[in-house]
Design a protein with these regions (language model features):
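Polytopic transmembrane helical bundles with strong interfacial aromatic enrichment
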Residues: 1-130
C-alpha cells in the first residue's frame, strides 16, 4: 500500500507524539518527583496518560483514513484528536512545570475537542457507505 503525503505526515506525528509521551512520562517519574508536589505530579501524569490514549486514537483515525481517503468526517476527527491532545496535554505540562494555574482554564478546551473528535469518529465509522 502506498501512503499518501497526509497519511505519512500523520503517521510521523503519531510516532513523535508517542515518543514524547514516553519521554514526558520518564521526565515526570524521574526528573520531577522531587520538584513537584504529589498533587502537581498527578496532574502532570494525567497529561502523559491522555497523550498516550489519544496517540492511539490518532493512529486509528489515520489508518481509517488510509482505508477510506474520501471520508471527510474521518479527517475532521483526526485533526480534532491532534489539536485536542496538544491543547490538553501541553497545558497540563506547562501548568505544572511553570506553575501557571491560568493554563488550567485551557485544559477543558482540549478535552472537549477530544470528546467531539471521538463522537465524529464514531459517526463517520457508522455512516460510511463506501
Amino acid at each position: 500500500m502506498i501512503f499518501d503525503r497526509r497519511a505519512r505526515i500523520f503517521l510521523a506525528i503519531t510516532a513523535l507524539l508517542m515518543a514524547s509521551a514516553i519521554a514526558f512520562g520518564a521526565f515526570g517519574a524521574h526528573g520531577l518527583k522531587n520538584i513537584l508536589t504529589a498533587e502537581m505530579l498527578k496532574v502532570f501524569h494525567t497529561g502523559v496518560e491522555y497523550q498516550f490514549y489519544n496517540t492511539f486514537g490518532l493512529f486509528m483515525a489515520t489508518v481509517l483514513i488510509m482505508l477510506r481517503p474520501y471520508n471527510k468526517k474521518l479527517k475532521v476527527a483526526q485533526l480534532l484528536i491532534l489539536i485536542g491532545t496538544l491543547i490538553f496535554s501541553i497545558s497540563l505540562y506547562l501548568l505544572t512545570i511553570l506553575n501557571l494555574p491560568i493554563l488550567g482554564a485551557i485544559t477543558p478546551i482540549g478535552g472537549t475537542l477530544q470528546i467531539i473528535a471521538y463522537v465524529i469518529l464514531a459517526y463517520a465509522i457508522l455512516k460510511d457507505n463506501q
